[in-house]
């Protein structure tokens, strides 16, 4: 979680997007907020997406 947290904070502060891999699918977006259990992101397609951190397989900075 600590490595994910670093990317979440970077995305939130710098308004940079991340790509999340979840069960073989990808979701892209910028972090709005996060806590110990979830991360909330927005994208061009969706205004609000809430992802369970326990479901995330990988995260990459765009």
Labelled PLM ranges:
Residues 1-28, 35-38, 42-62:
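Short glycine-rich, low-complexity segments
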